[in-house]
């Protein structure tokens, strides 16, 4: 069972927040919202579609991006081997860009594709627990 106001998909709970925060602040915020909470980790195309729908319905007219729980470690295009909640990255769906370090969902792709964004940018986000 998900906390009130959260949506369920395959045993996990999700909640989009229309609060503009940096990646680090958003991740910290998610850990405070629910037991086991983190920025969303997208591990299948089905989950990607579910999250895209959730964002589209709940975070209207965001400028462009929505944080997910993935950041690039180091200067190379070396993706972190795990999501912020510790789960490993097996599903990937991002747009190549110059090295920026944190990943967000891009509005132009219906919040389905991932794009590298500067981690200090303030964006809405989705928490998962």
UniProtKB/Swiss-Prot annotation:
Disulfide bonds join 2-13, 30-127, 102-119. Transmembrane segments: none annotated. One of its GO terms (molecular function) is calcium ion binding. InterPro entries: C-type_lectin-like, C-type_lectin-like/link_sf, C-type_lectin/snaclec_domain, C-type_lectin_CS, CTDL_fold. Pfam families: Lectin_C. It is found in: Secreted. Keywords: Blood coagulation cascade inhibiting toxin, Calcium, Disulfide bond, Hemostasis impairing toxin, Metal-binding, Secreted, Toxin. Expressed by the venom gland. One of its GO terms (cellular component) is extracellular region. Residues 1-129 form the C-type lectin domain. Ca(2+) binds at residues 41, 43, 47, 128. Belongs to the snaclec family. Heterodimer of subunits A and B; disulfide-linked. Anticoagulant protein which binds to the gamma-carboxyglutamic acid-domain regions of factor IX (F9) (but not factor X) in the presence of calcium with a 1 to 1 stoichiometry. PANTHER family: MANNOSE, PHOSPHOLIPASE, LECTIN RECEPTOR RELATED. This is Snaclec coagulation factor IX-binding protein subunit A. It comes from Protobothrops flavoviridis.
């Amino acid at each position: 069972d998900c906390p009130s106001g959260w949506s369920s998909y395959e045993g996990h709970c999700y909640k989009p927040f229309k609060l503009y925060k940096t990646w680090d602040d958003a991740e910290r915020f998610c850990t405070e919202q629910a037991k086991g909470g983190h920025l969303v980790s997208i591990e299948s195309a089905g989950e990607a579609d579910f999250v895209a729908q959730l964002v589209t319905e709940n975070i209207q007219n965001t400028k462009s991006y929505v944080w997910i729980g993935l950041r690039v470690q180091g200067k190379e295009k070396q993706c972190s081997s795990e999501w912020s909640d510790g789960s490993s990255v097996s599903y990937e769906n991002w747009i190549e860009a110059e090295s920026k370090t944190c990943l967000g969902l891009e509005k132009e792709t219906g919040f389905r594709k991932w794009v590298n964004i500067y981690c200090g940018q303030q964006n809405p986000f989705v928490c998962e627990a």
